[in-house]
Amino acid sequence: MNLLPANPHGNGLLYAGFNQDHGCFACGMENGFRVYNADPLKEKEKQEFPEGGVGHVEMLFRCNYLALVGGGKKPKYPPNKVMIWDDLKKKTVIEIEFSTEVKAVKLRRDRIVVVLDSMIKVFTFTHNPHQLHVFETCYNPKGLCVLCPNSNNSLLAFPGTHTGHVQIVDLANTEKPPVDIPAHEGILSCIALNLQGTRIATASEKGTLIRIFDTSSGHLIQELRRGSQAANIYCINFNQDASLICVSSDHGTVHIFAAEDPKRNKQSSLASASFLPKYFSSKWSFSKFQVPSGSPCICAFGTEPNAVLAICADGSYYKFLFNQKGECSRDVYAQFLEMTDDKL
């Protein structure tokens, strides 16, 4: 969740994002960065830079390396540089410079992936990074890109050169033709891979439909309806076994869908009437909850299989529990920016 150029809540938060298994989340601030355990909520690291802001923080599971990009009113680093921070040494150990602004960074143990506004560059994760690949994309100001963290699967997915298309490449075998998925007619707003790299979920700027595809064949597996009105999708995430997905939007709601068992999702009683528009046969979320503040948020599943977390731009943290019937209740509320190690 990128809150640049300005977070309307005035709390100094510029960026929030989960690590690869959603066990932690990192925040870029106007004065440094912070790392939290996601569930249970606990501040793990607070690095203050009195002289500058961090607009992007990318973790690598729970290891000591983080990718930082400067941002905010007084960026700590130039926004066209990726800095790899070693949290044991408390300093940057790798620096990669580009001719244009960095939109996002993705990490796996052997690769650094840097997203620019119309291309993606892949480097070795070594002390002197070596450029391996360059992939063209359509104009990609949001820096959309997902990298499978699984050691047995090196898939990288990003917007293709055609509007609404997703391209999937295997970094372990770039001779293999990429999988090209015409996911949506409109511009992509969000993409997400499951941990195993077998499924990809997509949404367009219209934000009414979420589509799930098989990454090896590109075949559509499920089409899910978030709502009938257009929405800006902030986040999509799978749970650990890819049986569920959660979706957050600017309508202040987080929806939970069954990704593997479509019978769990709600459907109109008119769904079987062949003469009615496709809308009536849509599969709707089986559970949803409202984020009380309505603030932009990212979402992921918690440590319990029936828990969903929401990390919000106003500094609020919510944990909701849902049951088989789809009923939802709030379990935890906290203000994560106001936490310190002493309070926990």
From Swiss-Prot:
What GO terms in the biological process aspect are recorded for it?
A: autophagosome assembly; autophagy of mitochondrion; cellular response to starvation; glycophagy; nucleophagy; pexophagy; protein localization to phagophore assembly site
SUPFAM superfamilies attached here? WD40 repeat-like
Q: Name one GO molecular function term.
A: phosphatidylinositol-3,5-bisphosphate binding
Q: Could you name the domain of life of the organism this protein comes from?
A: Eukaryota
Where primarily located? other
Entry GO terms, CC: cytosol; lysosome; phagophore assembly site; phagophore assembly site membrane
Where is this gene product found?
Preautophagosomal structure; Lysosome
Q: Which residues form a coiled coil?
A: none
WD repeat feature ranges = 183-223, 228-267
Query: Where's the motif L/FRRG motif?
Result: 224-227
Signal peptide positions (record):
none
Q: Mind telling me which SMART domains this protein's record contains?
A: WD40
**What InterPro entries does UniProt report for this protein, alphabetically?**
PROPPIN (IPR048720), WD40/YVTN_repeat-like_dom_sf (IPR015943), WD40_repeat_dom_sf (IPR036322), WD40_rpt (IPR001680)
Keywords, in A-Z order: Autophagy, Lipid-binding, Lysosome, Repeat, WD repeat
Family membership noted in the UniProt record: Belongs to the WD repeat PROPPIN family.
Task: State the domain notes.
Answer: The L/FRRG motif is required for recruitment to PtdIns3P.
| Protein purpose | Component of the autophagy machinery that controls the major intracellular degradation process by which cytoplasmic materials are packaged into autophagosomes and delivered to lysosomes for degradation. Binds phosphatidylinositol 3-phosphate (PtdIns3P), and other phosphoinositides including PtdIns(3,5)P2, forming on membranes of the endoplasmic reticulum upon activation of the upstream ULK1 and PI3 kinases and is recruited at phagophore assembly sites where it regulates the elongation of nascent phagophores downstream of WIPI2.
Give the protein name, as stated in the record: WD repeat domain phosphoinositide-interacting protein 3
